[in-house]
A protein has these predicted regions:
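Positively charged n-region of N-terminal signal peptides that target proteins for export
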Residues: 1-5
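Cleavable N-terminal signal peptides
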Residues: 6-7, 17
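Beta-strand-enriched cores of mature, soluble protein domains
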Residues: 18-144
Length: 144
């Protein structure tokens, strides 16, 4: 019985050690100011919907992006993949590839994605597309 009591106490204490409040230690630094994008095309499909957009994106210049959204069974969420190109200056074009998840809440499509950029940097993007408007904002945070 004494062994069982000690084992239960150790189990309870180990939970406190593992359950440290990590959320309060996670901080994300913005890569740049939020960027407004304009939707240029939406192609609705049975298995994939493709959304294309363009806009000015700080250090990446004029950016063109394409999001490919696949559906889960609920048709209100799924995975997203895509590509982006940014004309930084006359001789430099940055390329990015991204993967993530999307959900739809009413008329808002929420995308959360990781981006690998050709210069070696990585971003976590938070995007909320309002389907009632032709614009949306990309919030880019540094990962690497």
């Amino acid at each position: 019985m004494k062994t069982l009591l000690i084992a239960m106490m150790l189990l309870a204490l180990s939970h406190a050690a593992v359950g440290d409040d990590h959320a309060s230690k996670l901080t994300l630094e913005k890569r740049q100011a939020d960027s407004v994008m304009t939707v240029t095309n939406v192609d609705l499909g049975d298995e994939v919907t493709t959304i294309s957009a363009k806009g000015k994106m700080g250090i990446y210049g004029t950016v063109y992006v394409t999001y490919n959204l696949t559906y889960n069974a609920d048709r209100a969420s799924g995975f997203v993949t895509g590509q982006g190109r940014g004309a930084v200056d006359k001789g430099t074009v940055a390329a990015g590839a991204f993967r993530g998840i999307w959900t739809r809440e009413g008329s808002i499509v929420k995308i959360r994605q990781m981006v690998q950029i050709s210069d070696g940097s990585q971003n976590m993007d938070i995007i909320d597309i309002d389907m009632l408007k032709d614009t949306f904002v990309i919030k880019a945070y540094k990962v690497r």
